[in-house]
Amino acid sequence: MIMMGKLKYKIQVNPEKTARAMGRNIPISRKHAREICKSINGMKLDEAIKFLEDVIAMRRPVLFRRHCKKVGHRKGKLGWPAGRYPVKAAKAILKILQHAKANAEYKGLNTEKLRIKHISTNKGITIKRYMPRAFGRATPKFQETVHIQVILEEYH
């Protein structure tokens, strides 16, 4: 059994004007999650959803600014040469954004005028597995997980 501590949101906001959602222990790459969150932070919600759908369809790359060693360049004037298409991470973050949008709709906020006020990633648990090999040895097969938190705000 895995014991999890309480994970709080990084910033405190007015609950009447914001909606939030959190995904815990999502089995995606921390580096990919960080780069996607950095790309969509501050965007309008509809733009961010369209951006992630384009990443999933491999029409638009995510710019890799920190984790960019040995990352190929992408064509087009993007403002940064290195980029990739992290499809698995984009699907997971898109799902969390849709949950946050549903929470905003439930609260009565105007879903057409929402922007991402805060989105961040935290390191989750590491799922440790071992693959048996010959002569009594074992190879570790660790899976990293990520916590993602999103706060949406209504703008005017």
UniProtKB/Swiss-Prot annotation:
Q: What is the superkingdom listed in this entry's lineage?
A: Archaea
The record, for PROSITE patterns, names: RIBOSOMAL_L22
List the Gene3D superfamilies. Answer: Ribosomal protein L22/L17
A single Pfam family it belongs to is: Ribosomal_L22
Keywords, A to Z? Ribonucleoprotein, Ribosomal protein, RNA-binding, rRNA-binding
Q: Which GO terms describe its molecular function?
A: rRNA binding; structural constituent of ribosome
Cross-referenced CDD domains, in alphabetical order? Ribosomal_L22
- Keyword Metal-binding present in the record's keywords: the answer is no
Q: What is one cellular component GO term in this UniProt entry?
A: cytosolic large ribosomal subunit
Its function, per the record, reads:
This protein binds specifically to 23S rRNA. It makes multiple contacts with different domains of the 23S rRNA in the assembled 50S subunit and ribosome. The globular domain of the protein is located near the polypeptide exit tunnel on the outside of the subunit, while an extended beta-hairpin is found that lines the wall of the exit tunnel in the center of the 70S ribosome.
The record's similarity note reads:
Belongs to the universal ribosomal protein uL22 family.
Self-association and partners: Part of the 50S ribosomal subunit.
Q: Which PANTHER family match?
A: 60S RIBOSOMAL PROTEIN L17
Query: Which HAMAP family does this UniProt record tie to the protein?
Result: Ribosomal_uL22_A
Q: What is this protein called?
A: Large ribosomal subunit protein uL22
